[in-house]
Amino acid sequence: MDKKSAHRNPEDAKAGKYEGKHKRKKKRKQNQNQHRSRHRSVTSFSSDDRVFPSSSSSSSGSQTDSSTEDATQGKIKKKRREKTNKWRGKRKVSSEMSIILSGPQSLVHTICH
């Protein structure tokens, strides 16, 4: 009888450890959801910015202010896109060069010269 109780104790301890691991995973999932909600709030702000110019169409002064804000936001987005495109372009070039170099030498000569 003592052996059975001795076997039960380590099993209970193991179960406790596994429960702790599961709890940690749940916390990580919650953090990811909070991060996503922040991104959603950012996108909602950008949609609000688009609404403001239409509501301020009656006054000409506010129209110019909103148009400059929209222009700056567009510039920021374009800069980000250019950066990603540069990296993508480099990756494409490297993959194309590896394909060309692995091919017949006639292709390598025509492209290099």
From Swiss-Prot:
Residues 20-41, 75-92 have a biased composition (Basic residues). It comes from the Eukaryota. Residues 1-19 have a biased composition (Basic and acidic residues). Residues 1-94 are annotated as: Disordered. Residues 52-66 have a biased composition (Low complexity). This is Putative uncharacterized protein encoded by LINC00467 homolog.
